[in-house]
């Protein structure tokens, strides 16, 4: 387990580091909001082949501020869901079976503030968090693609 309270490491840095350690992985992320800068980082991560899929859960309220990113999100992220969410969880499951859980205070945005994180490879923690994230996705949220379809058509 690793942990820190720092203003020098961003969650995108942690994701890239974890992927460099475990190889190609499926990723689940929850956050209140996302910024264009962070989305660009995810774009480059996906283009590098480090991820097989990225699943994202964002808060309804915060997405009103990022409507201009919706089309970009749909091009970069495999699935995006909107719900009442303030959690910041990052789950990485490699094709080799590695399981990494990161709990952080940072939204998927860039800031110069102190943020905290805890990284663990405990499979029980991962499995519990993944089940809870999947429940949010499957039972408590609306896919962004459904909203885009309604808005565009």
Describe each model-derived feature in a short phrase.
Residues 1-153:
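PLD/PLD-like phosphodiesterase catalytic module centered on the HKD motif
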């Amino acid at each position: 387990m690793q942990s820190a309270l720092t203003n020098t490491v961003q969650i995108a840095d942690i994701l890239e580091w974890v992927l460099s350690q475990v190889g190609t992985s499926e990723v689940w992320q929850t956050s209140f909001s996302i910024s264009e800068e962070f989305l660009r980082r995810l774009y480059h991560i996906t283009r590098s082949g480090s991820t097989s899929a990225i699943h994202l859960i964002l808060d309804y309220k915060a997405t009103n501020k990022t409507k201009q990113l919706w089309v970009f999100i749909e091009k970069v992220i495999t699935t995006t869901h909107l719900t009442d969410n303030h959690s910041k969880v990052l789950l990485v499951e490699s094709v080799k079976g590695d399981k990494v859980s990161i709990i952080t205070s940072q939204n998927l945005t860039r800031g110069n503030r102190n943020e905290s994180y805890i990284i663990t490879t405990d499979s029980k923690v991962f499995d519990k968090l993944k089940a809870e994230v999947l429940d949010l996705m499957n039972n408590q949220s609306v896919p962004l693609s459904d909203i885009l379809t309604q808005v565009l058509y």
